[in-house]
Amino acid sequence: MSTQIDPRGPRFGAAITSTLLAVTVFLSLDAATLAASHALLGVISVSFLWGALRGPANHPYGFLFRKLVRPRLTAPKELEDSAGPQFAQLVGLLVAGTGFVLGIFGVTAGITIAAAAAFFAAFLNAAFNYCLGCQIHVGLKRLKVIR
């Protein structure tokens, strides 16, 4: 059973993630900073892994949100099930992790493409409150592919 979370928490995390992914894309465009972009994509992949395994409430960004941001906000109008955002973290892990592994095998364009794709999804969530991974989760539940 998943927990109920403040829906603003994952958006806060998506804002941090989209910033890191934008830096990753920028660094991946120059051969001199390609190694740094690869390392940063690895760190982001670990962050996605943490969120996929532990859920958004137990993610470091969730901790930062609870301690630094939420006390300054009014109570949320409603809570959301954490299953969708947790699934979105898994999708992020698959995308970013693929780019990281491709980078290990010398496919450096994979770093840029994966980081850009993950940035697109994270930015949609942060800026427009549209969680692409959550929508995939809902679609797969409707198709009865997952529970």
Task: Identify the role of each PLM range.
Residues 1-147:
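Membrane-interfacial helix-loop segments of redox and metal-homeostasis proteins
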